[in-house]
Curated annotation (Swiss-Prot):
Name assigned to this protein: Interleukin-6
Protein species of origin: Gallus gallus (Chicken)
Family to which the UniProt record says this protein belongs: Belongs to the IL-6 superfamily.
Keyword check for Membrane: no
Protein localization: Secreted
A matching Pfam family: IL6
Length: 241
């Protein structure tokens, strides 16, 4: 007897001959499973709704809260990265006498380091949020290889530079989350990173030291502009209460 026949048998009137003489076999656990699932699962899991169908606006509020947290986290982290870069520059000046006013700085200044320019929309006059955030995130991702070079070269500060690398990557990813079209953020592929890292290395120790100083100097400048841009965003971006 199949499951349908069992349901029909239990539907006979009590007291009829069929109900006294023939009892429907109890359906096994497998047969009951389709009936029990709606009772076992919470409503949201049983009938998932797309985010767009949420008329309560909770999804939008969650996205806003995430954007607010990301924005609030960016400024202090950017300040820390800027200050660490300044400290590393000071250490290089003390240990290697490679300082800002060294004449050797003119020897190698063709590193093509990321810079924030007027066209990037990060200046207070003509501030363009989407354009600026895209530039900042792309620039921070680009700095990864340069910082990795310092990590491999500046032995006495290897741990500090490693922390700088990790935090820079974290900030780049955080800012990327705030971009409307994150695909516009440029992230160097592994082949480009390996090629750049090889080009940064030199068999002359003093050239590598100058290279490190120039990287830290431009990274400090980039982070200073990042701090200003994020601070301005915090003042101007409006969130729902």
């Amino acid at each position: 007897m199949n499951f349908t026949e069992g349901c029909e048998a239990t539907g006979r009137r009590p007291g009829s001959a069929g109900s006294r003489r023939r009892r429907a076999p109890r359906p096994g656990p497998v047969a009951l499973l389709p009936l029990l699932l709606p009772l076992l699962l919470p409503p949201a899991a049983a009938v998932p709704l797309p985010a767009a169908a949420d008329s309560s606006g909770e999804v939008g509020l969650e996205e806003e809260a995430g954007a607010r947290r990301a924005l609030l986290d960016c400024e202090p982290l950017a300040r820390v990265l800027r200050d660490r870069a300044v400290q590393l520059q000071d250490e290089m000046c003390k240990k290697f006498t490679v300082c800002e006013n060294s004449m050797e700085m003119l020897v190698r200044n063709n590193l093509n380091l990321p810079k924030v320019t007027e066209e990037d929309g990060c200046l207070l006059a003509g501030f363009d949020e989407e354009k600026c955030l895209t530039k900042l995130s792309s620039g921070l991702f680009a700095f990864q290889t340069y910082l990795e070079f310092i990590q491999e070269t500046f032995d006495s500060e290897k741990q500090n530079v490693e922390s700088l690398c990790y935090s820079t990557k974290h900030l780049a990813a955080t800012i990327r989350q705030m971009v409307i079209n994150p695909d516009e953020v440029v992230i160097p592929d592994s082949a480009a990173q390996k090629s750049l890292l090889a080009n940064l290395k030199s068999d002359k120790d003093w050239i590598e030291k100058i290279t490190m100083h120039l990287i830290l100097r431009d990274f400090t400048s980039f982070m200073e502009k990042t701090v200003r841009a994020v601070r301005y965003l915090k003042k101007t971006r409006s969130f729902s209460a």
